[in-house]
Amino acid sequence: MKFVDEAVVKVQAGDGGSGVVSFWREKFITKGGPDGGDGGDGGDVYIQADENLNTLIDYRFQRFYEAERGENGRGGNCTGKRGKDIVLRVPVGTRAVDIHTNEIVAEVAEHGKKVMVAKGGWHGLGNTRFKSSVNRAPRQRTLGTKGEIREIRLELLLLADVGMLGLPNAGKSTFIRAVSAAKPKVADYPFTTLIPSLGVVSVVPEKSFVVADIPGLIEGAADGAGLGIRFLKHLERCRVLLHMIDIMPIDQSDPVQNALTIIDELEQYSEKLASKPRWLVFNKVDLMPEEEANEKIQEILDALGWEDEYFKISAINRSGTKELCYKLADFMENLPREEEEVAEEDKVNFMWDDYHKDAMAGKDVVTEDDDDWDDWDDEEDDGHVVYVRD
């Protein structure tokens, strides 16, 4: 199945049902009191994570999703039925972004998690709600409010522990083939990797981690050059980044400048991503004598002012890869897991007294004009007579 990690859809929550003006009808009772029921709330729109999905391709073909409208109220104080919600099933790791504000509306990082992306409209009030001692035959009602409409961009972010960075042909895919069972395409031309791929590395039965390989970056990627920085989002949840550097590029470019290019593009994309733990991995050390390779690596380290972790490997020969994997496993075992930023959910009060109190006093009240059959007069109430049997 084609890998699709981004799709734009329009979602519309259901409108709230309107209240109704109605009066009690019964044999021998010509004109009864008000019995107009409230409308039903509109249905909401949710996204829900499903571990059985791994692509957003379905949302490329259907772009509009609408929840059900709430039913209008009815006589006999019958409340309208609530509109049915609609749930969009997405792969684990998907987030929804409002395309107009770039606000992250929802994010589902674990199976079964369900988050609302569009709120249904409030129900309207029937005329029973307006009954009072001075208004015994109310003809007022309120209409249901409109449901929320949003255009959202669904973005699938791969869930991996280790993310790989580097220019095209640096050896990222070769490394994943060497340390895992994944078999991404490998060739001697740029941009062999066109979509992200994942590999599971099992150091020992009790220790394993997931590595993500993304298409190579080039200078100007932040401005859209090459494949752009579209795939960098897949590294946002990684706990450590491996910056792969080819010490003997096939195009004879400067490894120092190549490394600076990646660092610059990373910083332009996201300060948060640039601040993640990052290790340098010098690849293809088998292409030159050991002493010469060590001198070249030290030269690069000095030019970058690098004082953190670095490793020397030959991915194609699997030289140094085992040691690197053990180091990664130990590092992540001791690294405190990041706490997810969970936005505090809006507290929605479904009691009508708060929201509808304002609506009843405002301009949204609709008055039905029909005075012909009203047997209630507007004179001052003389009180009620209570009969008591001795």
Curated annotation (Swiss-Prot):
Subunit structure, as described in the record: Monomer.
Biased composition (Acidic residues): 367-382
Biological function: An essential GTPase which binds GTP, GDP and possibly (p)ppGpp with moderate affinity, with high nucleotide exchange rates and a fairly low GTP hydrolysis rate. Plays a role in control of the cell cycle, stress response, ribosome biogenesis and in those bacteria that undergo differentiation, in morphogenesis control.
Keywords: Cytoplasm, GTP-binding, Hydrolase, Magnesium, Metal-binding, Nucleotide-binding
Protein name: GTPase Obg
Subcellular location(s) of the protein: Cytoplasm
Name of encoding gene: obg
Annotated positions binding GTP: 166-173, 191-195, 213-216, 283-286, 314-316
Species, as recorded: Vibrio parahaemolyticus serotype O3:K6 (strain RIMD 2210633)
Pfam families to which the protein is assigned, alphabetical: GTP1_OBG, MMR_HSR1
Membership in a protein family: Belongs to the TRAFAC class OBG-HflX-like GTPase superfamily. OBG GTPase family.
InterPro entries: G_OBG, GTP-bd, GTP-bd_Obg/CgtA, GTP1-OBG_CS, GTP1_OBG_dom, GTP1_OBG_dom_sf, OBG_GTPase, P-loop_NTPase
Record domain Obg: where: 1-159
